[in-house]
Design a protein with these regions (language model features):
Chain B
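N-terminal Sec/SRP start-transfer signal
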Residues: 1-33, 43, 48, 52, ...
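Hydrophobic secondary-structure segments that place a key small or acidic residue at a functional site
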Residues: 97-98, 113-118, 132-204
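Mechanotransmission and gating elements of multispan inner-membrane complexes involved in transport
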Residues: 170-268
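Transmembrane alpha-helical interface segments in multi-pass membrane proteins
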Residues: 288, 297-342, 382
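Short helix-loop junctions at transmembrane helix boundaries
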Residues: 328-375, 388
């Protein structure tokens, strides 16, 4: 089943002579359960493409279909709700809410979804166990290591049962050993729950683990490699 | 609940900034409570000094009498009026008076002044004449008793027990008439106009002197609730009024006090306005700093599905807690100050309004329930209103730009 479908996706920044095409005529499809990495040099358009797929930015041309719904022209609350229910995000700098505990950070998105508190708490316990953070739920982000914080971010991304998880350089701030452990957790989730992951990365560990590599150069797909 | 907890905890991310903002807002509220208490205290002091000294809260006179104090403009038969006044449950007391200009003479000197004929028992309830007696006794009802002011007594070189001859014009014939009195008491109001120009005798003696048996010039009214006399009295006594009689509340009797009260209300409004600006700037500054510090975080929570409305609510709940904390702190400080000065008073010095000394030279702040309820609510509401702009600003943060800026 296709989870993501993009056709002739383009995004430009600036005007006139300063106009830059960050993404140019990008078309691809991603099936459920894929572990895909979008790779390329800095400035190749990886993050912009990830933002377009995640509904954080709208394309100037082309279309994006996510879980059967066209999102390119969604606006406001419709788009917020769609992101909340269908997309999980993992960012480079963890981006947990510092005043909430690990458990509360995970709970936050379920609160937005209107899930009742006992149900939220039960799910949080389950997911903390899944990402290997049992017993650390009460800790604030500042009291967790970088790897643990990123695991909380993974847990937050998957707890809303999204159709896809988008991860922008998730291992960039981690040492290689911690980064490897985190990737193993994500790979396990991919295997066990058939969760679809799309990474934007430079990290060779992710490239090695990915089942598909989309090479970007100057905003266009240079090569689409199935492993 | 998590939402409320998040807002509460956000408030203490930068404790020093929050406390400084709280201090600014709470100082504003404390000043507002204290200033309001002082203004209300001054209002009460002014009204009390003016109405309780001699004038009363309201007066009934013959139409035109107050213009020139023409003695022949008197109420010949006050029976109907007194009947109505007796039925009026709003009244706590009233007193009948006769007053006329005249010559006040002793064996050594003479001076012009105002002769008041009063009913001693009734008068006790509506004026401070009895309390102002510094020597001798208040009127007991005996026909030749007279009370004289300290300054006038010095001028006439008289003391207790000395004789005083009052000369006035008969109200009907305009012929001069005289009578002899003995000084039974010397009073000191502390107001020059009273102490050097007024004498008080019994009502019947004054009526006899002026040839107006049973007639009176003035009825002074005192109400259970002093605010009653601020209302339109002529409407409430409509059936009493005819072309001959007028009823005037203290605002009408002392228009200058009314003007002063308007200035005090304007003063409260100005203080409120200044506080509005101060609090607004403080809250806007604090919230914007807090939002700018968290711009990446706002980008993230927008990205994971928080709606604009939820962001607005989050900032407003934070502002509400900020206002609530500040209101609590300001209320305690403001009430403590106001309570202290309501007991001990603020020294005013010798301040006179319309020739009347204000109280005992101290201003006592007035505590009122609305200061505890409405002023803190005003401050919380003000904080919330001020937070609307930063809240909308936060809700408009574009996730991609916020994420790029932070990286």
């Amino acid at each position: 089943m296709k989870v993501i479908e993009t056709s002739n996706l383009s995004k430009h920044f600036g005007l006139g002579e300063t106009r830059v095409s960050a993404v140019k005529n990008v078309s691809f499809e991603i099936e459920e359960g894929e572990f895909t990495a979008i790779i390329g040099p800095s400035g190749s358009g990886k993050t912009t493409l990830l933002h377009l797929i995640g509904g954080l930015d709208s394309p100037d041309e082309g279309d994006i279909t996510l879980s059967g719904e066209k999102i390119a022209h969604m606006k406001g609350n419709q788009l917020s709700d769609f992101r909340r229910d269908h997309i999980g995000f993992i960012f480079q700098a963890y981006n947990l809410i510092p005043v909430l505990s690990a458990a509360e950070n995970i709970e936050y998105i379920m609160m937005l979804q209107g899930i009742k508190k006992p149900e939220r708490r039960r799910k949080v316990e389950e997911i903390l166990e899944t990402v290997g953070l049992t017993g650390l739920g009460d800790r604030r982000p500042a009291m967790l290591s970088g790897g643990q914080q990123q695991r909380v971010a993974v847990a937050r991304a998957m707890v809303s049962k999204p159709d896809i998880i988008l991860a922008d350089e998730p291992t960039a701030n981690l040492d290689s050993k911690t980064g490897m452990k985190l990737l193993e957790v994500m790979k396990e989730l991919n295997r066990e729950f058939k969760l679809t992951f799309v990474f934007s990365t430079h990290d060779e560990k992710i490239m090695n683990m990915a089942t598909r590599l989309i090479h970007l150069r100057d905003g266009s797909i240079e090569r689409d490699e199935q492993k | 609940m998590l939402y409320i907890e998040l807002a509460w905890r956000n408030l203490f991310r930068n404790t020093r900034r929050t406390l400084l903002t709280c201090l600014l807002i709470s100082t504003g509220l404390a000043v507002l409570i204290f200033a309001d208490g002082a203004i209300r205290g001054m209002e009460k002091l002014m009204i009390g000094s003016v109405t309780k000294t001699l004038q009363g809260e309201a007066q009934i006179n013959r139409l035109g009498f107050r213009d020139n104090f023409d003695v022949d403009l008197y109420i010949e038969n006050p029976t109907t009026i007194l009947g109505k006044l007796t039925e009026d449950e709003r009244l706590s007391a009233y007193s009948l008076r006769v007053l006329s200009g005249g010559m006040i003479g002793s064996a050594y000197n003479s001076a012009g002044g105002v002769i008041y004929g009063i009913n001693p028992e009734q008068e006790k309830e509506v004026s401070r004449i009895r309390d102002a007696i510094s020597e001798g006794n208040y009127l007991s009802g005996k026909s030749r008793e007279l009370l004289i002011g300290t300054t006038l007594a010095d001028l006439l070189e008289v003391k207790l027990g000395d004789r005083i001859v009052l000369t006035a014009a008969n109200v009907d014939t305009n012929e001069l008439t005289q009578d002899l009195f003995r000084i039974s008491g010397i009073f000191e109001f502390g107001a020059r106009e009273f102490d050097e120009g007024f004498v008080f005798v019994n009502l019947s003696a004054a009526q006899k002197l002026l040839g107006m048996e049973g007639g009176i010039h003035q009825i002074v009214l005192q109400f259970k609730d002093p605010k009653t006399s601020r209302d339109n009295l002529s409407l409430s006594y409509q059936d009493l009024e005819d072309k001959e009689i007028e009823i005037t509340g203290w605002l009408g009797l002392q228009p200058s006090i009314g003007a002063m009260l308007e200035y005090t209300n304007l003063g409260t409004a100005i203080i409120g306005g200044i506080l509005f600006i101060l609090i607004s700037l403080g809250v806007i500054n604090s919230l914007f700093m807090s939002i700018y510090e968290r711009i990446y975080e706002f980008g993230v929570i927008r990205a994971i599905g928080t709606s604009r409305f939820e962001i607005i609510s989050l900032v407003l709940v934070e502002a509400f807690f900020l206002g609530l904390l500040s209101a609590f702190l300001g209320l305690i400080v403001g009430l403590l100050f106001s309570y202290y000065y309501s007991i001990n008073g603020l020294p005013l010095g010798e301040m006179e309004v319309s020739g009347i000394m204000l109280g005992n030279g101290n201003l006592y702040t007035e505590l009122a329930p609305y200061q505890v309820i409405f002023l803190p609510l005003y401050v919380i509401l003000l904080t919330l209103i001020t937070a609307i702009y930063p809240a909308f600003f936060a809700s408009r943060i574009v996730p991609t730009r916020a994420l790029q800026r932070a990286l």
